[in-house]
Amino acid sequence: FSLAIRRANGEASRERVLDAAAQIAGERGYEGTSINLISERSGLPPSSIYWHFENKDELIAAVIDHSFEQWRGLTPIPHDTVAADRDEALTTSMRRAGRAIADANDFLRLGLMLALERRPEEAAGRARFLAIRQATRDELETYHRKVFGGDLDDRGLDLVGRLAMAVADGLFIAREIDDEGVDIEEAMELMGVALAVIADHLRARAERTG
């Protein structure tokens, strides 16, 4: 019984550390985040933080994983459920993604900040964020392959996937700048319409060029 309590307490303290680190890193970036600040925000001594994480680099990488799992729970890529109508599938999935971006943004805020930082030695958190993005793009390509069928070749699938993620990034940043001026759900739904038009254009161009 006492072991179970210790484990529960350990998990609870780890969650407090991760939440505090996510808040501070989102406010100050990687360089502005310190163990002392995390200690103050979480109410836990530095020794407790080091018990869970070897150093700040490892902690920030864990924050990326933790915030991604929370975000991903809200926006699963629908591998197996593709609407019969292509355009409906695109607008529905893009609107769902927009809702998730609007509702859970710690992962993207911190991840994009890390991605934009240039350091002599790459931070583990940045590497983790980029790896997650690549895995997400691969899953998105699998979904688009089902949605578009044989309409797009590999290059076309890669292009629409990159466009979808680039628009999501841009809308997120725009919402961070002006949270009253951007309806991410509506904008992402419109991007679904745009992707359908783009796919038709790419297919027609491929047919013309043979």
Residue ranges and their predicted role:
Residues 12-16, 20-58, 62:
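Helix-turn-helix
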Residues 65-71:
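Short, basic, alpha-helical segments at the C-terminal edge of helix-turn-helix-like DNA-binding modules
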Residues 81-84, 121-123, 133-160, 179, ...:
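Hydrophobic alpha-helical bundle segments that form small-molecule/ligand-binding pockets
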Residues 103-127:
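Amphipathic alpha-helical segments used for helix-helix packing
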Residues 107-115, 154-175, 186-197:
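Hydrophobic alpha-helical segments that form the core
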